[in-house]
A protein has these predicted regions:
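Eukaryotic phosphotyrosine signaling hubs
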Residues: 6-7, 87-91, 161-162, 249-252
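Low-complexity, glycine/alanine/valine/leucine- and proline-rich hydrophobic stretches
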Residues: 235, 247-255
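Short consensus segments that form the blades of beta-propeller domains
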Residues: 44-45, 81-83, 154-155, 244-245
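Hydrophobic, helix-prone linear segments
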Residues: 1-71
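Amphipathic alpha-helical segments
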Residues: 15-30, 102-108, 170-185, 270
């Protein structure tokens, strides 16, 4: 079984040029690929407006795949959706060395900050954090580590996508699903976020214990890079958006490289979680070459793709 987390984010977008320009301005390298009928079926895309674009981060094994569609395609997460409403994949997370500078930069590329950078303390880490959203309803979390410094070489401006969040209704069920897919939980927090932290999800000022969250982080090797974060609000009644989000605009999937993919798939297909399989294991034309891959949709509506790599 692979000990890697996700290495690719898939976005279905009506503004591919805008998103491409954003990542290229950060030094990501773009590569275009023509769609085949096989690819269109795999991504549940009845209509596209151009070729797909795969962007490679300059300093990490991380890619963003842009699938261009007409702006008449509905959003998987409508723009006015309350932040805490479960609806498939919620966000992608990127680090920055300067959140104020980044606020201006992302607005130049079509992102709308939902708050100014919010300073707060989580354990030993002092951070600034804020959310931004763009026209397809994709949510981007910007995190600046104020202290202590992050290990490794300094960033020039912003990092690759280092993790992703899913808001869930049944936390235990979603956690068990990730465990069955090889993602082991390595961190958990329950309660109110300290200081100004609740502002990030618009939970500050909630009465009683409504501002409490449960947060878990899972990744095959127990590291943050490529991890999936689950968040639930156990004391707030929420109605999830349960409509099938496949093929709609927004954050469409996370792609996970894995070793011995056939054994992994057969174990899933013969076990208690076989019902989450969305696309069976097959060789498909991805980026112009055959790739053995399959996809699942988790109980909370998040699509996760596994590919031989």
């Amino acid at each position: 079984m692979s000990e890697r987390g996700f290495s690719e984010v898939v976005m279905v977008t009506a503004v591919p040029d805008q998103l491409r320009a954003f990542y290229e301005a950060l030094g990501w390298q773009a590569e275009d690929h023509e769609f085949s009928p096989d690819t269109l079926a795999y991504w549940d895309l009845p209509e596209v407006t151009g070729s797909e674009c795969v962007l490679q981060a300059p300093d990490a094994d991380c890619r963003v795949r842009l699938l261009p569609v007409p702006n008449t395609v509905p959003l998987s997460r409508p723009l006015m959706t309350e932040l805490i409403v479960p609806c498939g994949l919620f966000d992608i997370n990127m680090r920055t060395i300067d959140s104020e500078r980044t606020t201006d930069f992302i607005q130049e590329h079509g992102w709308r900050p939902l708050t100014p950078p919010i300073p707060w303390q989580f354990g030993d880490n002092a951070v600034k954090e804020f959310l931004a959203v763009q026209a397809d309803g994709i949510v981007l979390v910007i995190v600046e580590r104020v202290s202590p410094p992050l290990p490794g070489p300094p960033m020039d401006h912003m990092s690759h996508v280092f993790n992703s969040t899913q808001l869930v209704l049944d936390h235990d069920e979603s956690l068990a699903c990730l465990e069955a897919l090889g993602f082991a939980k390595f961190a958990e927090f329950t309660g109110p976020l300290p200081g100004e932290g609740p502002k990030v999800l618009d939970l500050l000022g909630r009465p009683g214990d409504e501002g409490d969250i449960r947060l878990t982080i899972s990744q095959p090797a127990g590291v943050l890079d490529g991890a999936i974060e689950l968040i639930s609000t156990p004391n707030i009644p929420v109605t999830p958006i349960l409509e099938n989000g496949q093929g709609k605009r927004g954050l469409a999937a996370l792609r996970i490289p894995c070793d011995d993919i056939e054994s992994r798939y057969n174990k899933l297909a013969s076990g208690d979680w076989s019902h989450i399989i969305n696309k069976p294991l097959a060789n498909r034309s991805i980026d112009g070459a055959d790739q053995l891959c399959y996809a699942v949709v988790t109980p909370g509506g998040a699509r996760l793709d596994f590919f031989a790599g």
